[in-house]
Amino acid sequence: MDANDFPRLFYTSMPSSSTSNHRIDRLSSSSSSTFRRDDFRRHSTTTSSEKFSTISIGESVKLEEENGEIPEKFVQEEDTVVKTEETRVSDCDFSLTFYTAHVTSSSMLSRGDSSSINNKTFTPDDHYSNPSDKRREVPSIRSTSSNSSSFGGHVAFVDEPSEENQRQQQQYQQHQFQLPTLLVTSTPSTVFDQNDDDVFTSPYHPPNRQYSSSSEMSGLSFQLQSGIHKKSIAVEGNEIALRDLRNEAFQFVKEIYPEKKCGSLEDYILLYKHDLRSINILQLITTSSDVTDGTLVEIVIGSCPQNERIVVHPHTLFVHSYKVPTFCDFCGELLFGLVKQGLKCFGCGLNYHKRCASKIPNNCNGSKQRRPSAIPLSPSNSNILNLNERRQSRRDSCLEALDAARPSSTLGGAATPNIFITSDDCGDPVGGNFLQMPRKDRSCSWSGRPLWMEIAEATRVKIQVPHTFQVHSYKLPTVCQHCKKLLKGLLRQGMQCRGENETEKLQNGAVAKYCKYNCHKKCSEHVAKDCSGNTKASQFFLGTADDGVSEDRDDDLSLRSGSGGHKKAQNTPSAPLQGSEGSGSPGGAVVSFAQGLSNAPDDDVISSESANIPLMRVVMSKKQTKRKNNKLLKEGWIVHYTDQQNMRKKHYWRLDTKGITMYQDENTTRYYKEIPLNEILGVMTSSPEKSSEYLFEIRTGACVYFVYSSLTDEELYNIIHASPCIARKPSTVSSTDSGYLGSSGASSSCVRSREGSTVSSTITVDRTRRGGSTTSTENSEAESESSYSSFASIASTASKYLGRAADCLVLMTKRNGWSDAGSPADEKSSGSLDAQSWTTAIQSALMPVTPQSSVVGGKRVDKLKVPTEGETGHLGAKIQTEQEFSQLYQIFAEEVLGSGQFGTVYGGIHRRNGQHVAVKLIDKLKFPPNKEDLLRAEVQILEQVDHPGVVHFMQMLETTDRIFVVMEKLKGDMLEMILSSEKGRLSERTTQFLVAQILEALRYLHHQNIVHCDLKPENILLNSNSDFPQVKLCDFGFARIIGEKSFRRSVVGTPAYLAPEVLRNKGFNRSLDMWSVGVIVYVSLSGTFPFNEDEDINDQIQNAEFMYPPSPWKEISENAIEFINGLLQVKMSKRYTVAKAQSHIWMQNYTIWSDLRVLEKAVGQRFVTHESDDSRWHAYEKEHNVTPVYV
């Protein structure tokens, strides 16, 4: 074959036309061959560049086939490849001829212009230079390219069927249909196969998707290829979700093979992208970001169905000692310490705090592993690889990683996500298995986050959520997590994604709102929009998903572990995750998922997550007032232990009129614990006849405090021991030792004075038991007196430095059996006297509190104190003593029903009739005189109202410093009912039943011009534990008297349930309660709060997807949503009134009316329904032949 056998293909300059498409003409061809670069150089020795002008940007180009010579400009370009090839397809009745011209170098354009021609559309011309060729052109040919330095044209012409084609078609019909196979080449830059030829047919237009035929479009365009078939797809937006991509591929396969039954073909589809820069041209598509503009997607049909699995690469973490300052790769803070500062991953080499180990992603990429010398650094030298090992490794990783991109919904049904962890991932990527490491280097207690979190992460919708940065001052050296450089400065060093991580503070395990990402101010603009905090919260209700939302399968509770993507790690040992022989999967281990789910929420709970805050009990902040000016009754050093913990603890006790406070020392304000006097049930001294270890005991409802002594055993030894600065721990005290040590002998101690001097002495001590003998001989009276004199001298010497001779003497006389007179101990030792002084002081403090002043905010509040008894108090109640109140009611201090800003509610019982009551104790000392109306409002309102829907007020008693409000006691509250329900939310029927009673109670209160102002589920009490209980409103501490057309402006209520006008400090009226009703209905039906506190309420209300995500609102009626929207109106004039809410169609239901009639029959009073509705519902019963249940 000589040079004349090769067709000549030229690009020539043409004037720009009005159309943006390049025109390509086929002039003539006499043969079909494949050209290489060397062939072009060999057969093109002469040039006539004068004949051809250069190509400029924007000009049209024409592909010609002439007998002229190829311009030198095109021949010498390294990236110029021209190929012609003719292929006959056995399953079609026509043959295809391909002509491909690629210009991939910007130097081929006009001189000095480095731009390129992008996204051009090539279409066949309407005429051919050789009219004898009878060809049918393929309609609507379109091609796009994402390479910014190349443009290309691809032309396909269809021949009329020949005799050979007809014969091949008949042979094909006799054989079974076979799906195209996967071709993998090791030299992608020089090898061309039929899968790389661009054959275009009419573009596919699936339903419900907008496509554009224009070459200039702002969306995403890519190509689908299956065998020799190829389609161009254009979608709006910059990304396409993997679920939609798989659907496009599935529809494409169905279209090109319409006669075949696809069935569950979607389970067999694998999607790859062509990447000529990689060793293996075809790269598995795992995320939506893999599909960019111009990507060629190869559809490969697997030999077996691929179950949905989630791929994780767990880190192999072990304790590591760093020689240079190192920062945590998770939080960015410095790893402090001299040795064993943190954990290092054996695979990827990343470093973490131990505290961060349970939060890190399972994303070990093994980048730390050493590259073998045989592995090339570029694809061009890839033929030296051991292809068998590489293909096996690549095939395993691809098959295991493919399911990270699978949609959860399949044709055959949903499947529970599986997790596959290969043994290669868990072993040593460099030198052997992880278990072969020395035990001292192995970490069996640190790993990543739990597996159920991997499922939630993999199945969530991945949307771009920007970080909310705020200037932050760091207390520890921290690096920027974007540029990995240190945040310099003393204050305001950088920016942090704002908000504190409140995961540990929330008992229901709610996720944090912010990710606390750290970066420089200059780097904040370049940080990716991937805030994990908000994304977690808003993942399940935003349209499409990358990986799809997986459906649950109850019968699949095990997860196969495998290698995979970059996710965050589980709280199980790293080593046990590796595979073992006989595990059931090649190269991997089948790991039971039962343990992973034992402490994790159910899949139903995971799938129902939304951007809204989970419903929880809102705790009002208490005003913790520490009255430093209270009358001090007694103070001193005390050693104590409890019946629950036998460890001796020494603190400086201060007894005042409110309680006992255990301080760290005499001067500090920090205290260890506080025992309020109202929690003390009794104080008892130890019996003199019985030998005991403690002096006296303090009994509370929670535990018993045993007062051991005023000095510890260790401190006593420090006084009497003479060896320099060595304090020995005391031996175990026997029950017959009366609290003193059972050993004797000579010892030494180092006593440091307050000025810092040191005194050392060696003393021999013979210790006696009370009424007993020593281990050597019986002590005589003279020996006892001699020993006592020794101890007395020691105490006197120590007192010069400690200043506590009395305490030393008391302790020694108590423990050694000597009295202060020098004789053996009797019942009236100094220890007993010291115990009696403490018990007397505590018992005196437990007596009724005498009138005394307190200081709040620097102002005296004596105005609220009433010095004499029997008079009328400020609230109109008769002053009584606490003894008189205790004779009438018994308060159960351990039964705390609730606590709030004004006081605490305890359970109690009426001593005379045995009726259980709720007693609200309000401490008047917490309120200054100008807030006295807050105390009076609730009492006045409760005395005024009388309705079955409002809690019944019984009695109010006032003492000198407390107010006792006695009310009826009910079973529980509405919040407890919601949280304890099976799904964490109530059904529509139950919600309607409760809301109907709430609205009726509000109608009564508003008629009395009373606005509750703090309506929330915690303040809605239930009288029973049934599904349809009676409800009553309580807690009128924020209630206000507001007329029909009046407005008030004050601080009221709980922010989570307050209307916008209150939060903005604007005037509010009785419609405030209606907003609260809307929030109550929302949280009852969904189990979440409707709004986020950091976003504008108007924007959240207008965003229907935010307010009502599919889970669970797709199960709730439209009337309920309309009812909520009518209540949650920002403008007060548009908000429903009580009457309008009661007449709403959602509340007008026969089932509700029937349930309410049953309740009224049980109560014995008709207070919710009205007689005017009876005729309408009786007619409904007759029309639908319904038997009433309320009769």
UniProtKB/Swiss-Prot annotation:
Domain Protein kinase: 891-1147
Residues that bear Phosphoserine: S1046, S1050
Residue stretches of biased makeup (Basic and acidic residues): 123-139
PROSITE patterns: PROTEIN_KINASE_ATP, PROTEIN_KINASE_DOM, PROTEIN_KINASE_ST, ZF_DAG_PE_1, ZF_DAG_PE_2
Modulation of this protein's activity: Activated by DAG and phorbol esters. Phorbol-ester/DAG-type domain 1 binds phorbol ester with low affinity. Phorbol-ester/DAG-type domain 2 binds phorbol ester with high affinity and targets the kinase to the cell periphery, enabling phosphorylation and activation by colocalized tpa-1. Both domains 1 and 2 appear to bind DAG with equal affinity so may contribute equally to translocation and activation.
PH domain boundaries: 632-713
Gene Ontology cellular component terms for the protein in this record: cytosol; membrane
Biased composition regions of type Polar residues, renumbered to the chain: 756-765
Catalytic reaction annotation: L-seryl-[protein] + ATP = O-phospho-L-seryl-[protein] + ADP + H(+); L-threonyl-[protein] + ATP = O-phospho-L-threonyl-[protein] + ADP + H(+)
Region of interest (Disordered), residue spans: 11-48, 108-155, 549-594, 730-786
InterPro entries, sorted: C1-like_sf (IPR046349), Kinase-like_dom_sf (IPR011009), PE/DAG-bd (IPR002219), PH-like_dom_sf (IPR011993), PH_domain (IPR001849), Prot_kinase_dom (IPR000719), Protein_kinase_ATP_BS (IPR017441), Ser/Thr_kinase_AS (IPR008271)
Cofactor: Mg(2+)
Gene3D superfamilies tied to this protein: 3.30.60.20, Pleckstrin-homology domain (PH domain)/Phosphotyrosine-binding domain (PTB), Transferase(Phosphotransferase) domain 1
Main location: cytoplasm
A single GO molecular function term of this UniProt record: protein serine/threonine kinase activity
Enzyme Commission number, as recorded: 2.7.11.13
Keywords: ATP-binding, Cytoplasm, Immunity, Innate immunity, Kinase, Magnesium, Membrane, Metal-binding, Nucleotide-binding, Phosphoprotein, Repeat, Serine/threonine-protein kinase, Transferase, Ubl conjugation, Zinc, Zinc-finger
Zinc fingers (Phorbol-ester/DAG-type) by residue: 314-364, 466-531
PTM (free text): Phosphorylation on Ser-1046 is the dominant regulator of catalysis, phosphorylation on Ser-1050 has a lesser effect. Prolonged phosphorylation results in ubiquitination and degradation.
Family: Belongs to the protein kinase superfamily. CAMK Ser/Thr protein kinase family. PKD subfamily.
Function: Converts transient diacylglycerol (DAG) signals into prolonged physiological effects, downstream of PKC. Acts in the intestine to regulate both innate immunity by promoting activation of pmk-1 and also stress response and life span by acting as an upstream, negative regulator of the daf-16 transcription factor.
Protein name listed in UniProt: Serine/threonine-protein kinase dkf-2
Native source organism of the sequence: Caenorhabditis briggsae
